[in-house]
Amino acid sequence: MSGEKQAEESIVVSGEDEVAGRKVEDSAAEEDIDGNGGNGFSMKSFLWHGGSAWDAWFSCASNQVAQVLLTLPYSFSQLGMLSGILLQIFYGLMGSWTAYLISVLYVEYRARMEKQEAKSFKNHVIQWFEVLDGLLGPYWKAAGLAFNCTFLLFGSVIQLIACASNIYYINDRLDKRTWTYIFGACCATTVFIPSFHNYRIWSFLGLGMTTYTAWYLTIASFLHGQAEGVTHSGPTKLVLYFTGATNILYTFGGHAVTVEIMHAMWKPRKFKSIYLMATLYVFTLTLPSASAVYWAFGDQLLNHSNAFSLLPKTRFRDTAVILMLIHQFITFGFACTPLYFVWEKAIGMHHTKSLCLRALVRLPVVVPIWFLAIIFPFFGPINSAVGALLVTFTVYIIPALAHMLTYRTASARRNAAEKPPFFIPSWAGVYVINAFIVVWVLVLGFGFGGWASMTNFIRQIDTFGLFAKCYQCKPPPAPIAAGAHHRR
């Protein structure tokens, strides 16, 4: 690693933007050398220390396709087949663009900080709200912190709800609320994972698990064939259409942790196209599985937000359930780790080197997540509500606006650490795309999507109530009559 760094430093680079960008890469590489303690190979480093472009790709792809694999067929039943496919592609590409914007702003922020203040981030994890603060000021910091933390909080809640929903299809002797208690305790162990730098083996395994599950859903649906009397009537209601659309918006809005993943890389500038590459792979999982399950079961999915509930119990389904449970533990860690960082910084413990002490101070973060998962156990509808109210701003509107404002002056554009991508030759083109995203997501995602998602969410509360003991469970068998009991 040190030899690679020396080779990079020997290259004469012209232009302030390239020098600043190279400083970002070199300082990140130095941090990794310090953390690994040399060039010697060890199994611990191989499994535990991940900062390559491949590590970032696995992290992005693994984090993007968690429990949404199981709710996308439900969204297809609300949208119809054609809209479901087209919106996946559209929001996937839009999400890749805003992830690119976030990566550009991270490089810009870090280059400016290291150039102006000679600031070292050796023991400090840069987060999205700090990027906004450094580039645009305290009001943007407050907005980024509020939206990002709330989204990640509910993202963690969704993983707990999904754990309880999935395990119920293997063991229904316990209700879903009890399973939520159990998995809340299990997921609390993520406090021992220091940062995204240490998710190497977990990201690799997590993507393998979702790949198995996606192809299980696809193959099992085709082998099952179409259910008797199946109908495909979607879309039938505007409220259902926009609810399904915002669930897909949520699916491809998993880059609330982009900055933390970039910071864990040895060369953060390489992140620019990684999210797009991850999204293209995710398409190979989400499009076939959602289409196949919807083809097989049609409108039945409107009352079954978890695709596992309609497939017959087999050892292959049980395997998929178990793998998804493990993956949801990993995704819980992905969503919660930035919250751990924020909490550590708030109480002045972020630079503590003791792993056990950091784990201890992180535990209070898990408690409200646990509590909210018990209050709102609505697997499926909660995804759409979070997508409409939080993802719209966190990963679409705020990054697009922040990019436009950061480079609003000619001098900022001239000295930018990253120029527009090769396929957009001018800054005007970048501004047009960003403005389109802001208007589209604000009107259709937040406006119509928020109305539809909250209408559906409130309907779930009215039907099942808060603290529902077993959301969408089969009703218990009728009790045996007293007279029949005496005759036995």
UniProtKB/Swiss-Prot annotation:
Belongs to the amino acid/polyamine transporter 2 family. Amino acid/auxin permease (AAAP) (TC 2.A.18.1) subfamily. GO terms for cellular component: plasma membrane. Pfam families: Aa_trans. Its main location: membrane. Residues 83-84, 163-178, 224-238, 295-320, 384, 449-488 are extracellular. Keywords: Amino-acid transport, Auxin signaling pathway, Cell membrane, Glycoprotein, Membrane, Symport, Transmembrane, Transmembrane helix, Transport. Carrier protein involved in proton-driven auxin influx. Mediates the formation of auxin gradient from developing leaves (site of auxin biosynthesis) to tips by contributing to the loading of auxin in vascular tissues and facilitating acropetal (base to tip) auxin transport within inner tissues of the root apex, and basipetal (tip to base) auxin transport within outer tissues of the root apex. Residues 1-36 are annotated as: Disordered. InterPro entries: AA_transpt_TM (IPR013057). It is found in: Cell membrane. Residues 1-64, 106-141, 200-202, 260-273, 342-362, 406-427 are cytoplasmic. It comes from Arabidopsis thaliana (Mouse-ear cress). Glycans are attached at residue 303. The chain crosses the membrane at residues 65-82, 85-105, 142-162, 179-199, 203-223, 239-259, 274-294, 321-341, 363-383, 385-405, 428-448. One of its GO terms (biological process) is amino acid transport. It is a multi-pass membrane protein. This is Auxin transporter-like protein 1. It comes from the Eukaryota. GO terms for molecular function: auxin influx transmembrane transporter activity; symporter activity.
